[in-house]
């Protein structure tokens, strides 16, 4: 099945223009073993979460205080570009990522109810994580503090564990994780090459930040011609500008796979701010940018492997921070224990050009290793 794009014109022009909380809240729930793809035409399969209606997702997202801008669908993934970040729905797994003062965890009861409606009793694995907030005093319940978030999560997952990774007076990262007693049902089917990279960047260079201030459609027409705009007449203005900004800023190149078959859905907010989702088979990448000088932030997350990108993890990280001109960044890398990991990866993390490594921490989780590292430009 070829990926398809559905644009929600009604929700496509909203944006908060003042100081903005870029760092996202990220929730990931795994419900069961992956359901097979490449089904024969007449075969009826349990699509799991992918069978959930758009109305149900809209209802859930309303609890988190965000809306859908557009959706890219493929056989393996439904990728939702949101007014505040992104959501990725697989048959057995959901990833919800929201920024600003959204109340992501307030959507958890509805999310679990929706999962139950398609046959999932409870998650086999849960991750909730976020970087330290820029404006913690502006957050709404249940996000007014990490302690409050943990208390709320433990109402649903009482055996979950809380971690604060990195120095609390500098860039650091919070994680809540839980495993069901029968997690082994899922562990046997894990992809041995599974890896998820997050690069969380602050203090962007002014030159790079300006790329994510919305140009006018007249500027796009002048640069690319009327045909460029005309061929995208099924898109909203924000999506037309998003496609142009993705090209000009290097975002499209950053998200391109080695076979050039990835599909990108990008949106440029007016007057400022940028979001994009990319899907490739059962893989994704997502980028979100808050370019204001006093609160600049950009994030890049992907589970596309180094083999599919055609470059090493270290090269992807270097390309990412160069694209956004970050003066500070931290990263997290979850890798399956069976992955063909880059040799001497920890040593390579010392040698990014123009950056000093401040922290390097490794956690050993069931089935996965977690690496956290933070860097400052020198």
Swiss-Prot record:
Do you know which PROSITE patterns this protein is assigned to? ADOMETDC
Which Pfam family is one of this chain's hits?
Answer: SAM_decarbox
Disulphide connectivity of cysteines: none
Q: Which residues carry this modification: Pyruvic acid (Ser)?
A: 85
Q: InterPro entries, per this entry?
A: AdoMetDC-like, S-AdoMet_decarboxylase_euk, S-AdoMet_deCO2ase_core, S-AdoMet_deCO2ase_CS
Enumerate the UniProt keywords alphabetically: Autocatalytic cleavage, Decarboxylase, Lyase, Polyamine biosynthesis, Pyruvate, S-adenosyl-L-methionine, Schiff base, Spermidine biosynthesis, Zymogen
Q: Which domain of life is it from?
A: Eukaryota
* Pathway annotation: Amine and polyamine biosynthesis; S-adenosylmethioninamine biosynthesis; S-adenosylmethioninamine from S-adenosyl-L-methionine: step 1/1
Q: How is it modified after translation?
A: Is synthesized initially as an inactive proenzyme. Formation of the active enzyme involves a self-maturation process in which the active site pyruvoyl group is generated from an internal serine residue via an autocatalytic post-translational modification. Two non-identical subunits are generated from the proenzyme in this reaction, and the pyruvate is formed at the N-terminus of the alpha chain, which is derived from the carboxyl end of the proenzyme.
Q: Could you confirm whether the keyword S-adenosyl-L-methionine appears in this record? A: yes
Cleavage (non-hydrolytic) (site feature) positions: 84-85
Give the family per the record: Belongs to the eukaryotic AdoMetDC family.
> What's the protein here called?
S-adenosylmethionine decarboxylase proenzyme
Lineage at the top is: Eukaryota, Fungi, Dikarya, Ascomycota, Taphrinomycotina
Give the gene that encodes this protein.
spe2
């Amino acid at each position: 099945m070829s990926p398809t794009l559905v644009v929600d014109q009604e929700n496509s022009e909203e944006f908060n223009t003042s100081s903005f909380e870029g760092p996202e809240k990220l929730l990931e729930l795994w419900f069961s073993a992956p359901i097979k793809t490449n089904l024969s035409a007449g075969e009826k399969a349990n699509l799991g979460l992918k069978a959930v209606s758009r109305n149900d997702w809209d209802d859930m997202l309303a609890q988190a205080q965000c809306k859908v801008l557009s959706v890219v669908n493929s056989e393996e993934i439904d990728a939702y570009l949101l007014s505040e970040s992104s959501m990725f729905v697989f048959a057995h797994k959901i990833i919800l990522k929201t920024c600003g003062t959204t109340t992501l965890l307030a959507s958890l009861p509805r999310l679990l109810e929706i999962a139950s409606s398609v046959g999932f009793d409870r998650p086999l694995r849960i991750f909730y994580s976020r970087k330290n907030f820029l404006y913690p005093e502006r957050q709404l319940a249940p996000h007014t503090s990490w302690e409050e978030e943990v208390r709320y999560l433990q109402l649903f997952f009482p055996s979950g564990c809380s971690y604060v990774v990195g120095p609390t007076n500098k860039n650091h990262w919070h994680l809540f994780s839980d495993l069901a007693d029968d997690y082994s049902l899922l562990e046997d089917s894990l992809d041995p090459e599974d890896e998820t990279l997050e690069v969380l960047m602050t203090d962007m260079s002014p030159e790079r930040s300006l790329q994510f201030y919305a140009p006018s459609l007249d500027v796009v027409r002048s640069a690319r011609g009327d045909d460029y705009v005309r061929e995208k007449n099924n898109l909203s203005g924000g999506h037309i500008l998003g496609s142009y900004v993705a090209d000009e800023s290097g975002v499209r190149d950053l998200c391109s796979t080695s076979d050039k078959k990835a599909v990108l859905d990008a949106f440029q907010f007016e007057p400022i701010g940028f979001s994009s989702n990319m899907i490739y088979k059962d893989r994704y990448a997502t980028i979100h940018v808050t370019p204001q000088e006093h609160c600049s932030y950009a994030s890049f997350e992907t589970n596309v492997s180094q083999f599919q990108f055609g470059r090493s993890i270290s090269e992807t990280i270097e390309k990412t921070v160069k694209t956004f001109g970050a003066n500070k960044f931290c990263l997290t890398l979850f890798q399956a224990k069976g992955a063909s990991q880059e040799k001497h990866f920890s040593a390579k993390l010392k040698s990014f050009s123009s950056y000093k490594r401040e922290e390097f921490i490794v956690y050993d989780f069931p089935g996965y290793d977690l690496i956290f590292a933070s860097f400052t430009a020198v």
